[in-house]
UniProtKB/Swiss-Prot annotation:
Domain of life: Viruses
Signal peptide as annotated in the record: 1-50
Post-translational modification: N-glycosylated.
Stretches for region LVD motif: 237-239
Cell location: Virion; Host endoplasmic reticulum lumen
UniProt name for this protein: Outer capsid glycoprotein VP7
Gene3D superfamilies assigned: Glycoprotein VP7, domain 1, Rotavirus outer-layer protein VP7, domain 2
Glycosylation site residues: 69
Amino acid sequence: MYGIEYTTVLFYLISFVFVSYILKTVTKIMDFIIYRITFIIIVLSTLSNAQNYGINLPITGSMDTAYANSTQNDNFLSSTLCLYYPTEARTQINDNEWKDTLSQLFLTKGWPTGSVYFNEYSNILEFSIDPKLYCDYNVVLIKFTSGQELDISELADLILNEWLCNPMDITLYYYQQTGEANKWISMGSSCTVKVCPLNTQTLGIGCQTTNVATFETVADSEKLAIVDVVDSVNHKLDVTSTTCTIRNCNKLGPRENVAIIQVGGSNILDITADPTTSPQIERMMRVNWKKWWQVFYTVVDYINQIVQVMSKRSRSLDSSSFYYRV
């Protein structure tokens, strides 16, 4: 009887030792596998980061995520550039392959084929209403035309800054501007804006609220007018509503991914003197007028210097939305 008990105890003891040995062996094997896999992953990760040139990334528009390039200093490999030009340029060049030619020339300056977009507009009015500034960098070419200096200057103020606007019902309400950043922006084929300042009794100051002929004219037959009046004073407005709209807008700050190149003209239009323009950084420049080919060649030559005074936006931005936001 005692022999059987000793045999049973010995059997369990040997089994325990054997199982312990198996578990230790399995643990060593698993540790070896885990360490080896971890080492391989670290080595492969290091090698893959060193080879991440980013050249094969598809560039189809502004990207929400900025793709960092650890081995390439050229910032334009992951950027998009939009070039806006008047219809006159395409008509004068009269070459079906002119955009391809310019794309190849931009390539010599570090802008890959497919990263530069050419956008045509017919006139200042059309462009101011719906500019569609979608790219990381947006360069607008504006041909200087005598008699349109004011429209061009106000277009520059419009697209070089971000605005938050609300509709105005001038038939029911009086309006006042609350500060230097608060303007009334009027757009249309022909905008004439008249105002009548009011005192605390809502009586006209130097004008009669019931007689539009006595109102003060602040914009006359303009396509685009940014109206500035005395702050904190109520005004009754009269606008050519059949050909024009007007909105109450606040300037939020500079739109730093936009630059304007004035083509021709004796002097460059300067909007930096406006106290609401902050910071006072010039993003308007002028090139001499010769032929449109010469203008585009100049832009290609200096494009990298131009974007140095701009700030890249990593997301698409429809500039026209500023005018219709409520």
